[in-house]
Swiss-Prot record:
Subcellular location: Secreted
Main location: secreted
A GO MF label: protein homodimerization activity
Ranges for region 10 X approximate tandem repeats: 67-266
Membership in a protein family: Belongs to the apolipoprotein A1/A4/E family.
Keywords: Cholesterol metabolism, Glycoprotein, HDL, Lipid metabolism, Lipid transport, Lipoprotein, Oxidation, Palmitate, Phosphoprotein, Repeat, Secreted, Signal, Steroid metabolism, Sterol metabolism, Transport
UniProt protein name: Apolipoprotein A-I
Lineage of the species this protein comes from: Eukaryota, Metazoa, Chordata, Craniata, Vertebrata
Gene: APOA1
Described function: Participates in the reverse transport of cholesterol from tissues to the liver for excretion by promoting cholesterol efflux from tissues and by acting as a cofactor for the lecithin cholesterol acyltransferase (LCAT). As part of the SPAP complex, activates spermatozoa motility.
Residues recorded with modification Methionine sulfoxide: 109
SUPFAM superfamilies: Apolipoprotein A-I
Assembly: Homodimer. Interacts with APOA1BP and CLU. Component of a sperm activating protein complex (SPAP), consisting of APOA1, an immunoglobulin heavy chain, an immunoglobulin light chain and albumin. Interacts with NDRG1. Interacts with SCGB3A2. Interacts with NAXE and YJEFN3.
A GO CC annotation given for this chain: chylomicron
Biological process terms in GO annotation: acylglycerol homeostasis; cholesterol efflux; cholesterol metabolic process; lipoprotein metabolic process; phospholipid efflux
Length: 266
């Protein structure tokens, strides 16, 4: 269990560097990455859900029930936004502490990544060069056909398509050959990187388990602190949801009661 906790922590915290393995961009911090993903997801769900609620309220059934779902949805969105603001600093502190505790191990893994990157870069450059050559060759072969189409009549379109088809298949096959060659060239380095990570984690376990135990204890401590600090914000969320749920419940009961009265009157 300790090895699993440490492995997940290290892999997640080094994820931003590994994600930029073939790039020169400055990697995001783990918290920035999590925050961006969570924000995008919540915004998409919130906006999409509000659209559905608005469409339902605009329908004949929605107008008849008059549940005021849109008002409740906006209240809920406001409550969730407040929760995000309250928990944000607490979660930031958690990731900062976890980053600090695993700094040495992450530096060693990043060093391994950079070493492998330098070794495979020539293969990537060669692949890019060959791909550009193939595209240029394809463009040269296609150019006369395009001129022929412009000069010819519409009925030549089918003939042009028949000529382009084998050229496209040739480009696809040649590109597949280059990709397979690149995959074969990079395979040993991917395996080497995996073995290095496994070796570093194994060394931690064999070193008396002290370091691994310390990482696990500190991670558990940070998680407990995060849980305790988040309790007030979660309680605020619960309290904020109660009026929304109660309002929805009252509106729904009133709508059902009104519908029942209309049925009985018929």
């Amino acid at each position: 269990m300790k090895a699993v906790v440490l492995t997940l922590a290290v892999l997640f915290l080094t994820g931003s560097q590994a994600r930029h393995f073939w790039q020169q961009d400055e990697p995001q911090s783990p918290w920035d990455r999590v925050k961006d993903l969570a924000t995008v997801y919540v915004d998409v769900v919130k906006d999409g859900g509000r659209d559905y609620v608005a469409q339902f309220e605009a329908s004949a059934l929605g107008k008849q029930l008059n549940l005021k779902l849109l008002d409740n949805w906006d209240s809920l969105s406001s409550t969730v936004a407040k929760l995000r603001e309250q928990i944000g600093p607490v979660t930031q502190e958690f990731w900062d502490n976890l980053e600090k505790e695993t700094e040495v191990l992450r530096q060693e893994m990043n060093k391994d990544l950079e070493e492998v990157k330098k070794k495979v870069q020539p293969y990537l450059d060669e692949f890019q060069s060959k791909w550009h050559e193939e595209v240029e060759l394809y463009r040269q072969k296609v150019a006369p056909l395009g001129a022929e189409l412009r000069e010819g009549a519409r009925q030549k379109l089918q003939e042009l398509q028949e000529k382009l088809s084998p050229l496209g298949e040739e480009l696809r096959d040649r590109a597949r050959t280059h990709v397979d060659a690149l995959r074969a060239q990079l395979a040993p380095y991917s395996e080497q990187l995996r073995e290095r990570l496994a070796a570093r984690l194994q060394a931690l376990k064999e070193g008396g388990g002290a370091t691994l135990t310390e990482y696990h204890a500190k991670a558990s401590e940070h998680l407990s602190a995060l849980r305790e600090k988040a309790k007030p914000a979660l309680e605020d969320l619960r309290q904020g949801l109660m009026p929304v749920l109660e309002s929805f419940r009252a509106s729904l009961l009133a709508a059902v009661d009104e519908a029942t009265k209309k049925l009985n009157a018929q």
